[in-house]
Design a protein with these regions (language model features):
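A general structural motif
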Residues: 90-91, 110-114, 136-139, 166-174
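Flexible loop/turn segments at secondary-structure boundaries
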Residues: 13-16, 47-51, 116-118, 141-145, ...
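Generic beta-strand/beta-sheet core signal
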Residues: 8, 111-113, 136-138, 156-160, ...
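A contiguous, well-structured "functional interface" segment within a domain
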Residues: 119-122, 126-160
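His/Asp/Glu-enriched, well-ordered alpha-helical/loop segment
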Residues: 1, 107, 146-149, 154-202
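Extracytoplasmic/secreted envelope proteins and their assembly/folding machinery
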Residues: 70, 74, 95, 118, ...
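Short, mixed-charge, low-aromatic patches
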Residues: 76-79, 98-103, 134-138, 158-164, ...
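Polyanionic/metal-chelating signatures
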Residues: 2-132
C-alpha cells in the first residue's frame, strides 16, 4: 500500500519497551532494520476515565490513583538513571533499555491525550533531563501548543478519521488538530495505531 517505513512498537503495561524503525521491503529482520531501539514507550496514567462502554457511555470519573501512578513512574526512572550512573557489574535489562534517553540517542514516546497528562509529561521531561520526547495520541495537545514548542516536544496524532471524544466538541476537531499544532510551531506527525490497522492504511 505504499508504506515504506514503520516503527514497530510494543504494547501493554506502563512501559511497554523499546521500538525500532524498519523498512517493509526486506528479506529478513536484519535487512529490514533501519534503526534499532530508537525509543522507549511509556503509557502515561489517565487523570480520569469514562464509565460504561461504547454503546452505553457513562459519566467521567476521576482517577484517584493518578498521583501514586505518576510517582511510581518517577521512582522507576530514578532507579534506572541511578543504575546507569553506577559501576554495578550486575546487568539489569529493563534499566539498560533506558540508556540513551538523557543523551538524546533515544526518544521517550509518551502515550497521553489529556491536557493535564501532557503537561505533566513535559514537566517529567524537564525534571529528568530527557532530551527528546514525543507525545503519542495528543488529542488535547493543541491546548498546550506553546508549552510543547518551548520544550521541543513533538506530537504523533491518532487517526484523523475519528469522532470527537466528547459529544459537545467540534465534530471536525480530529481533522483540525494537526493544523492547530503546526500553527503553534509544533512538529506533528500522523500515526495509525489501534484496531484494524491494516485496513486503515489502505
Amino acid at each position: 500500500n505504499g508504506v515504506l517505513l514503520a516503527q514497530i512498537t510494543p504494547r501493554g503495561g506502563r512501559i511497554p519497551g523499546t521500538s525500532s524503525i524498519v523498512q517493509l521491503d526486506a528479506w529478513n529482520w536484519e535487512d529490514a532494520t533501519i534503526k534499532t531501539d530508537d525509543g522507549i514507550h511509556l503509557n502515561w496514567p489517565r487523570s480520569y476515565s469514562r464509565a460504561g462502554w461504547w454503546a452505553e457511555p457513562g459519566g467521567i470519573e476521576m482517577n484517584k490513583n493518578y498521583d501514586p501512578q505518576v510517582k511510581a513512574i518517577q521512582e522507576y526512572f530514578d532507579n534506572a538513571f541511578a543504575y546507569l550512573g553506577s559501576k554495578n557489574t550486575k546487568k539489569d535489562i529493563p534499566y539498560e533499555a533506558m540508556k540513551g534517553l538523557q543523551s538524546g540517542e533515544k526518544t521517550l514516546f509518551v502515550n497521553a491525550n489529556g491536557e493535564k497528562e501532557i503537561i505533566d509529561a513535559v514537566l517529567f521531561k524537564k525534571k529528568n533531563n530527557i532530551k527528546n520526547m514525543t507525545i503519542v495520541g495528543g488529542y488535547y495537545a493543541f491546548k498546550v501548543g506553546a508549552l510543547l514548542k518551548e520544550n521541543n516536544v513533538s506530537v504523533l496524532l491518532n487517526r484523523v478519521h475519528s469522532l470527537p471524544l466528547l459529544e459537545d466538541e467540534d465534530v471536525n476537531l480530529p481533522y483540525k488538530n494537526a493544523k492547530l499544532l503546526v500553527d503553534a510551531g509544533v512538529l506533528v506527525g500522523l500515526q495509525n495505531a489501534g484496531d484494524m490497522e491494516r485496513m486503515q492504511t489502505r
